[in-house]
Amino acid sequence: MRLLAAIGVLAIIGVFGAALYFFGGFYSVAGTQEDPAIVHWALVQVRTASIVRHARDPQPADFDDPANVQKGAHEFDEHGCANCHGAPGGNWQKFSEGIHPDPPDLKDVVPERTPAQLFWVIKNGINMTGMPSFGPIGATDEDIWQIVAFLKKLPNVSEADYKAWTKPPAPPAPPAPPAAAPTPPPADAPATPPAQNQ
């Protein structure tokens, strides 16, 4: 009985101590500091479990068609994904070094995720990270599946292919100028005499 009472007292002290630590402002939320190992571990476990549970969207049958892969590279570039995650032949932008946790190198992450999980993350974002949700800002499901198709091929995409797929389209040719209207004769020019019958 005394043992149970002691355990109960210690549990209460632990709860109050944790509450004081977190709600008393002692836990630093600065992006320049790493989370304690136990906090980092807990966040990773919660994040992974949440993604696995919520990623239920069925992938389109032809989502990894080569044309979709190329369109996905264009969408990846247009939405600024390379700024934080890099791209074949491209570097991360300087500001991404200030994001915590660090944006992952997608070549390492993609093999660990199913297409449905990648789709869910891109569409919904991840709370308490720098990963935004692209669904609410105009990316359609088709756009996102194309990005997923590109990501699944990313480990084998060359710099030359990426540059070719993301190259801006050539501007359309300017319209041809309208044909010039015939110049009317001057007002004081003599009229052409009518032809006379012979």
PLM regions with names:
Residues 2-74, 135-150, 167-189, 193:
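Periplasmic c-type cytochrome electron-transfer domains
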Residues 68, 89, 121:
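Short glycine- and Lys/Arg-enriched binding-loop motifs that mark or flank ligand-binding interfaces
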Residues 70-82, 112-117, 126, 138-141, ...:
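Sequence context surrounding c-type heme c attachment/ligation sites in exported
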Residues 74-100, 124-128, 132-133, 155-160:
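Periplasmic/extracellular electron-transfer cofactor-ligation site
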Residues 88-91, 110, 135, 193:
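Short, well-ordered turn and helix-capping elements at secondary-structure junctions
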Residues 98-154, 198:
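Extracytoplasmic electron-transfer domains, predominantly the class I c-type cytochrome c fold
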